[in-house]
């Protein structure tokens, strides 16, 4: 016998449920989603420019300095401080100490700076530390 044709029932239509579209993400950084009344603050770059200028005026009150020379001097000071900090950190690590003290700084000055310059730097540094501790 031939199989009976399956009775076809009308399919009930259910309302199609639409998925909500992905919403646009609002940027959370300061660039796009700033609050009203607040301005984006500029990150301040710390320099030694005012101190360089003060020392220049102490030594030579009648002489000025160009912005390019100031920038070069500032870079020089940053480089020297970076070398001294690195050397001091090495010394502290060698001696298995967790803290960089004035002794490590003094030793690193003697190692990094040449001859007479190191002697003057050590004496000025000692004088500054003495003045700081007594005040």
From Swiss-Prot:
Keywords: Acetylation, Chromosome, DNA-binding, Isopeptide bond, Nucleosome core, Nucleus, Ubl conjugation
Main location: nucleus
SMART domains per record: H2B
One GO MF term: protein heterodimerization activity
Ranges where the record places region Disordered: 1-43
Post-translational modification: Can be acetylated to form H2BK6ac and H2BK33ac.
PANTHER family reported in the protein's UniProt record: HISTONE H2B
Family under the similarity heading: Belongs to the histone H2B family.
Protein name per UniProt: Histone H2B.4
Organism encoding this protein: Triticum aestivum
Protein's gene: TH153
């Amino acid at each position: 016998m031939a199989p009976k044709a399956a009775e076809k029932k009308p399919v009930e239509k259910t309302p199609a449920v639409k998925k909500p579209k992905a919403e646009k993400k609002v940027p959370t950084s300061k660039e796009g989603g700033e609050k009203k009344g607040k301005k984006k603050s500029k990150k301040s770059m710390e320099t030694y420019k005012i101190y360089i200028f003060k020392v220049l005026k102490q030594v030579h009150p009648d002489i000025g300095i160009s912005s390019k020379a100031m920038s070069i001097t500032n870079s020089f000071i940053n480089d020297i401080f970076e070398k001294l900090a690195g050397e001091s950190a090495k010394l502290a690590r060698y001696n298995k100490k967790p803290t960089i003290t004035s002794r490590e700084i003094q030793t690193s000055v003697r190692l990094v700076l040449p001859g007479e310059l190191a002697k003057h730097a050590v004496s000025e540094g000692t004088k500054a530390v003495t003045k700081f501790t007594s005040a």
